[in-house]
Swiss-Prot record:
Changing W421A: Abolishes interaction with TTGN1 and EGFR. This is AP-2 complex subunit mu. The lineage of its organism: Eukaryota, Metazoa, Chordata, Craniata, Vertebrata. A 1,2-diacyl-sn-glycero-3-phospho-(1D-myo-inositol-3,4,5-trisphosphate) binds at K341, K345, K354. The modification Phosphothreonine is found at T156. PROSITE patterns: CLAT_ADAPTOR_M_1, CLAT_ADAPTOR_M_2, MHD. Residues 170-434 form the MHD domain. GO terms for molecular function: clathrin adaptor activity; disordered domain specific binding; lipid binding; low-density lipoprotein particle receptor binding; signal sequence binding; transmembrane transporter binding.
C-alpha cells in the first residue's frame, strides 16, 4: 500500500515525513524534489514514476503532498486519501500553509498515526478524529470509561462518522443541490456535447443520532454502459432523471437506494457531501448563445451575439459573463449592448460582456465592430468559441428534492421540529458555442 508520505513547501524542503515501508529510502525524498518540484518543465501528471517508484501528488497553495509506493496500488484510493488528508488538516487548523504546518506538526503526526496504519488508510472522518484528538493535538489522559467506550464504538463500530451525545438548541438541516453544466454547441444551435456534474451537500445541526430520509425525482434511472430509459415518466407525471454514475457518502444505506430510490442515512455532524453524480440526458440548457460573425474586407469584422434565457420567467440568473474572442491583430473595438456592460480587453483578446441579472424567457444582444491591423499572415482566424459564465437558481439536470424527513426516536423529536432549507444552484462549467 502507501510506503511513505511527504509534505514539501514550494522550495522542496520537507515539512512532514512519515515512512511506513522499508523499501522507501531517503533518496525518494530527493527524487521527488528534483524531478517534480524543481523540474524544468511543469509536471502535469498527478502520478510520476521514478526508478520503479510511484509518486502520487497533489498541491494546495504552495504545499505539496506526495504519497510514495513501490507496489501496484489503487490510484483512486491513494488520491482519495490525499484529498481527505487535506480536508482533515483544513478542519483542524484552517488554511494549509507552510506556517500552519510548522505550527501544528505534532498534531499532523498524531493524525497520520490514526489515519494510516502501516500504510493502509483507516479512519479519515473528521468528526471521529476530533473525538480523541483535540484541537491542540494533545490526547486527554483523564477519560472516563463511558468516554472511552464512546470513542471505541465510534472508531470500530458501524457509525464511525458521528459521535454520540450531540445536542443543539435548535435542530436545523441545510441541503444544497450544486450543479455544473458543461456544453459545446455548434453555430447552428446543435448540441455537440453536454453533461452535468452535480453534488448534494448537506449541513447537519441535529441532536442525538437522527435517521434521515431523502427522496429525489419519482423515478431515477441509473444508466449502465450507456443504456437506459431516460425518457420514461412516472405514473404521477413527474419527469424522471437519468444518472450515468453516482457515488455516496459512507453513511448512506445503499440497499435502500437500490430498492426504493430513496437515500436513508445517519448524517455526520456539520457539513459533508452526501452524494456526487453525473448525467448526460435531458439537460435543461439555461442559455442559448446565437453568434453571427461577418468579415467586411480584410481589416474589419462585424460581430453580433444574442443570448436567450431558457427557464421560467419567475427565476433570475446572476453573474452572467459572455466572453467573445477577437483576432490577435485587433486594433480597436466599438461595442453596443442592450443590457449590462461590455469592455474590450486587449490583454485577453476578448470582449467581456457582463450582466448582473436576467430573468427567464428573455433575450439580449451585443453588437461590435472590430478594426484589424493589416497582416501578411495568410492563415485565417481560427474563431475560438464564445464562452459563458452564469449562476441560476435551479438544477439543470432536472433533479428535484421531493422530501427530506428526520426522525430521532430516543430524544423524542420529529420531522416537524426540524427547520429544513433546500437550495438549488446551477453554475456554468465549460459552456461554449462555436462561432
Amino acid at each position: 500500500m502507501i510506503g511513505g508520505l511527504f509534505i514539501y513547501n514550494h522550495k522542496g524542503e520537507v515539512l512532514i515525513s512519515r515512512v511506513y515501508r522499508d523499501d522507501i529510502g531517503r533518496n525518494a525524498v530527493d527524487a521527488f524534489r528534483v524531478n517534480v518540484i524543481h523540474a524544468r518543465q511543469q509536471v502535469r501528471s498527478p502520478v510520476t514514476n521514478i526508478a520503479r517508484t510511484s509518486f502520487f501528488h497533489v498541491k494546495r497553495s504552495n504545499i505539496w503532498l506526495a504519497a510514495v509506493t513501490k507496489q501496484n496500488v489503487n490510484a483512486a484510493m491513494v488520491f482519495e486519501f490525499l484529498y481527505k488528508m487535506c480536508d482533515v488538516m483544513a478542519a483542524y487548523f484552517g488554511k494549509i500553509s507552510e506556517e500552519n504546518i510548522k505550527n501544528n506538526f505534532v498534531l499532523i503526526y498524531e493524525l497520520l498515526d490514526e489515519i494510516l496504519d502501516f500504510g493502509y488508510p483507516q479512519n479519515s472522518e473528521t468528526g471521529a478524529l476530533k473525538t480523541f484528538i483535540t484541537q491542540q493535538g494533545i490526547k486527554s489522559q483523564h477519560q472516563t470509561k463511558e468516554e472511552q467506550s464512546q470513542i471505541t464504538s465510534q472508531v470500530t463500530g458501524q457509525i464511525g462518522w458521528r459521535r454520540e451525545g450531540i445536542k443543539y438548541r435548535r435542530n436545523e438541516l441545510f441541503l444544497d443541490v450544486l450543479e455544473s453544466v458543461n456544453l459545446l454547441m455548434s453555430p447552428q444551435g446543435q448540441v455537440l456535447s453536454a453533461h452535468v456534474s452535480g453534488r448534494v451537500v448537506m449541513k447537519s445541526y441535529l441532536s442525538g443520532m437522527p435517521e434521515c430520509k431523502f427522496g429525489m425525482n419519482d423515478k431515477i434511472v441509473i444508466e449502465k454502459q450507456g443504456k437506459g430509459t431516460a425518457d420514461e415518466t412516472s405514473k404521477s407525471g413527474k419527469q424522471s432523471i437519468a444518472i450515468d454514475d453516482c457515488t455516496f457518502h459512507q453513511c448512506v444505506r445503499l440497499s435502500k437506494f437500490d430498492s426504493e430510490r430513496s437515500i436513508s442515512f445517519i448524517p455526520p455532524d456539520g457539513e459533508f457531501e452526501l452524494m456526487r453524480y453525473r448525467t448526460t440526458k435531458d439537460i435543461i440548457l439555461p442559455f442559448r448563445v446565437i453568434p453571427l460573425v461577418r468579415e467586411v474586407g480584410r481589416t474589419k469584422l462585424e460581430v453580433k451575439v444574442v443570448i436567450k434565457s431558457n427557464f421560467k420567467p419567475s427565476l433570475l440568473a446572476q453573474k452572467i459573463e459572455v466572453r467573445i474572442p477577437t483576432p490577435l491583430n485587433t486594433s480597436g473595438v466599438q461595442v453596443i449592448c442592450m443590457k449590462g456592460k461590455a469592455k474590450y480587453k486587449a490583454s485577453e483578446n476578448a470582449i467581456v460582456w457582463k450582466i448582473k441579472r436576467m430573468a427567464g424567457m428573455k433575450e439580449s444582444q451585443i453588437s461590435a465592430e472590430i478594426e484589424l491591423l493589416p497582416t501578411n499572415d495568410k492563415k485565417k482566424w481560427a474563431r475560438p468559441p464564445i464562452s459563458m459564465n452564469f449562476e441560476v437558481p435551479f438544477a439543470p439536470s432536472g433533479l428535484k428534492v421531493r422530501y427530506l424527513k428526520v426522525f430521532e426516536p430516543k430524544l423524542n423529536y420529529s420531522d416537524h421540529d426540524v427547520i429544513k432549507w433546500v437550495r438549488y444552484i446551477g453554475r456554468s462549467g465549460i459552456y461554449e458555442t462555436r462561432c
